[in-house]
Amino acid sequence: MNIGKYIFAQVIDFIPRYQFDKLVKKYKGDWHAKDLSCYNQLLHLLFGQITGCVSIRDICLCLEAHGSSIYHLGIRKSVNQSNLCRANEKRDYRIYEGLGMYLIGIVRPMYSNTKVAEITIDNVLYALDSTTISTSIVLAAWALGKYSKGAVKMHALLDLRGSIPANIHITDGKWHDSNELDEIVPEPFAFYMMDKAYVDFIALFRFHKAGAYWISRPKDNMRYEVVNHRIDFDPSTGICGDFIIKLTTHKSKKLYPEPIRMVTYHDSVTGNDVEFITNNFEISALEVANLYRHRWDIEVFFKWIKQNIVVKNLWGYSENAVRTHLWVAIIAYLIIAKIKADYKSPYSITEVATLIRVSALERVDLRDLITKPKDSIIQKQNFKELTLFDEF
């Protein structure tokens, strides 16, 4: 039991300190450090992420206001805004990148048995996508985006079993999504769901030869011919067609010489027919559509990262500061995911993060906080609401 210990102090107990110290030593993070060590910098930034501070100024102001409690939060000493900004600019971001990748290796296996809704196959399922964070081209000249604007891209390969990232890659805004396939080592028998921006037949054929499966949507200018019709589908499920096609342009059929499967699905909500392409010929046509639909799980992940883990406003503009900020955001997400798995919380990762955020400065037991049955909390809330209205 951790009654008497702040929630935030209990959360940071999940940081793999030995591994972090090894990274600090490797990249000489604490070289000539006085008041602000790399670990203290990490705690300041995690405090900002977990409590929802929107700027470095907010972090320092909040910790200063709780000066009498700061030691009990696990933070050795609070620092001013300029020192924290300077650390973000100068301390090697690879320290935090290394910690993030280490946590990915720990947390992903904890969710390996999680089932994906409406999916019957046991293959590993990945969604690949990116999110763009706008910034000032004047303040962040390194982060070139489209139309002479500044932008930073976070590319994520998300394991759909638990929505845990398998890989994170941060680039400037001009890095094309299809280039990201070159950064991935295909996993045999795994499914990779991606939108049409990733359709690069050289890379997709490399995935195919490696024994991996991919599902995407055809680009508008894709030229092909139907070589066979598959008839083993149920039209009542929304499947309109299941075909085997071959690419017909000289360049594309040279880049991808093998047949491709095309599935057409009628979306009853929008009234539109949607086409999918894949190199898998074994699963049902409806399974193809359902798998691609789960690609939207990564959009929910990005939206949650932006809204709940603080990346709406960047905490610095140099490349090192931006990468540090984004990696600390991912570290916060992974720590919360680890807490949920370790304590077998019935709540989603989002709900666990919310409970921790609103209780960060309370002295309660973390396990009790996130494992209380949902029904008891709802009943307690309803009782309070009824009591309130009974007074009128």
Q: Model regions: which residues?
A:
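Extended, structured, electrostatic nucleic-acid-contact surfaces
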Residues: 67-74
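A short, hydrophobic/aromatic-rich structural module that often spans a beta strand
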Residues: 75, 112, 382-386
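Active-site- or DNA-interface-adjacent structural scaffold in DNA-acting proteins
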Residues: 76-141
